[in-house]
Design a protein with these regions (language model features):
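Extended alpha-helical scaffolds
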Residues: 6-148
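Structural detector for short beta-strands of small beta-barrel domains
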Residues: 146, 152-184
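Accessory, solvent-exposed terminal regions and/or long lumenal/extracellular loops of proteins
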Residues: 169-171, 182, 187-205
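Generic detector of bulky aromatic hydrophobic side chains
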Residues: 46-49, 53, 164-170, 190, ...
Length: 205
């Protein structure tokens, strides 16, 4: 009888533990929604700045304007948008280089950055609004999550069904890149799955 009572208590204790683990999900959902809304605010800022840049033209940016845009870059860090933040850093860097040497390559690179920022702002907004409409605000496998600066954890990849165990891989190539604007080194590894022929890459920052 004592053993049954003990077993019952252990079961109740275990169930209580499970319930305690489930409780934070509501907090996580609220935090996720709050973060998404903050990101949308950041996209509003990107829209205003990019529209201004397109209207005035990149070549008209002066020293004072560059300082203002650098302040905007810092602000983007408060909006959970590290992806667009790095892109904006690169845009400013290319403009500075263009003003120094007048090499049109830098100007074209700056334009490409601006185009990407506009695209991320529009598509990112649609993606984030769609995420808010979902009942489950878990991480999705949409690449826009990565474009906005999100980084998938191994546990999240597993939940998304993107984790593969016991895979036999061969490394096809390896390279290290350095982004002068963001001051970030990135190690890239390119792999092929021997069994499926699927090619993928890994990136370490």
């Amino acid at each position: 009888k004592k053993e049954k009572t003990k077993a019952k208590k252990e079961k109740e204790s275990a169930e209580g533990t499970v319930k305690e683990k489930k409780a934070p999900s509501k907090v996580s959902k609220a935090a996720r929604a709050k973060k998404i809304n903050k990101q949308i605010e950041g996209l509003d800022l990107i829209k205003n700045i990019s529209t201004q840049l397109l209207k005035l033209g990149l070549s008209t940016i002066g020293t004072v304007s560059l300082k203002e845009y650098k302040d905007v870059v810092k602000q983007l860090g408060d909006y959970y948008l590290p992806g667009p933040q790095i892109l904006f850093q690169k845009l400013i860097f290319e403009i500075q280089e263009y003003k120094e040497d007048q090499d049109t390559v830098h100007y074209q690179q700056a334009l490409e950055c601006l185009k990407r920022l506009r695209a991320i702002e529009k598509k990112g907004r649609e993606y984030l609004n769609a995420e808010l409409e979902k009942e489950n605000l878990g991480i999705s496998d949409n690449t826009l999550y990565e474009d906005l600066g999100g980084v998938w954890k191994l546990e999240q990849l597993n939940d998304l069904g993107l984790k593969k165990e016991n895979a036999r891989l061969i490394q096809l190539a390896f390279e290290v890149t350095y982004d002068e604007a963001s001051k970030i080194f990135t190690d890239y590894g390119y792999w092929i799955d021997i069994d499926s022929g699927e090619i993928s890459y890994t990136a370490n920052y």
